[in-house]
């Protein structure tokens, strides 16, 4: 085997897994459907499925009991999906940590990685769309991504009916 063949094989395997996940997500979006795991089991199982498909290992900590309001579940799922996808595509990270907790009438999300940082709301449509969606629901989103030090994305989404109707 030529030098570096094992590393290349691992990278190709990761790329194939990532592309398969993206194609599945695109199919669901094109049909206007939520991921099956989200519709059937709620946020925890859906994020578990997302983590298993990720090209970068995901340490998942979900502190949510029962179902959240649909708007909050969908927004939380897509916020995590966007952050994990960006990590896999741009960060050169070796790990991602996803923390989700619902308490005090809000859901808190934190997605952090050990990548190269440099993420910015001004670059690319994914983060801009995510920011717009979170703010349209009355939520808050913060991005800390200094070059060379990884990225931390914090999202707070309200669970009350008034903010949900802002959609």
Q: What kind of region is each of these model predictions?
A:
Residues 1-167:
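Coiled-coil dimerization/phosphotransfer module
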């Amino acid at each position: 085997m030529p030098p570096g063949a094992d590393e290349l094989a691992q990278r190709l395997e990761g790329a194939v897994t990532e592309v398969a996940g993206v194609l599945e997500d695109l199919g669901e979006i094109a049909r206007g459907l939520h991921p099956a795991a989200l519709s059937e089991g709620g946020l925890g199982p859906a994020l578990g499925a997302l983590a298993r498909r990720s090209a970068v290992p995901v340490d998942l900590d979900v502190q949510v009991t029962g179902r959240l309001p649909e708007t909050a579940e969908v927004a939380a799922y897509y916020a995590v999906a966007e952050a994990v996808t960006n990590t896999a595509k741009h960060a050169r990270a070796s790990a991602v940590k996803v923390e989700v907790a619902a308490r005090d009438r809000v859901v808190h999300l934190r997605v952090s990685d050990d990548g190269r940082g440099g993420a910015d709301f001004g670059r690319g449509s994914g983060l801009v769309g995510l920011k717009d969606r979170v703010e349209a629901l009355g939520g808050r989103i913060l991005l800390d991504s200094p070059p060379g030090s990884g990225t931390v994305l914090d999202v707070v989404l309200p669970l009350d009916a008034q903010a949900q109707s802002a959609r």
